[in-house]
């Protein structure tokens, strides 16, 4: 996938396995996977972190193939859905860290420019999530209150 603020076209992509059935060697049932997701979600992990742990520690390649639902949908059903989507959260976190850096290094012009790019990505993603009703329509990103969102 190509980058938004870079000249490269991007040819890298991941390929899902063709077989969509559960492997015969996998000992976890759908209910066990759901319990693991619930347990890891209560610890405060993001859906992608949960997926990585399930893949590396338990051998679950795709939660959707085992359970029929994605990690985020399972978390939503249990009531552990994050307040703001994961990708937006990490963009806000990055913007907050760059702002903190700029307080100490006022003359860092490149960081100022990168902050503008990151904040434009935040606004674009927030607009998308408002349309999809993931965020409330009155949600607004403000740099002054952003550190409270990611704390």
UniProtKB/Swiss-Prot annotation:
State one Pfam family annotation.
Ribosomal_S13_N
The record's listing under InterPro entries reads: Ribosomal_uS15, Ribosomal_uS15_arc_euk, Ribosomal_uS15_N, uS15_NS1_RNA-bd_sf
Instruction: Respond yes or no to whether keyword Ribosomal protein is given for this record.
Output: yes
Q: Which GO terms describe its biological process?
A: translation
Citing just one GO molecular function, the answer is: structural constituent of ribosome
Q: Write down the CDD domains for this protein, in alphabetical order.
A: Ribosomal_S15p_S13e
Keyword terms = Ribonucleoprotein, Ribosomal protein
Gene Ontology cellular component list: cytosolic small ribosomal subunit; nucleolus
Keyword Ribonucleoprotein among record annotations = yes
Similarity remark: Belongs to the universal ribosomal protein uS15 family.
Q: Which NCBIfam families match?
A: PRK08561.1
The record, for PANTHER family, names:
RIBOSOMAL PROTEIN S15P/S13E, SMALL RIBOSOMAL SUBUNIT PROTEIN US15
Protein name according to UniProt: Small ribosomal subunit protein uS15
- In which organism is this protein found? Anopheles gambiae (African malaria mosquito)
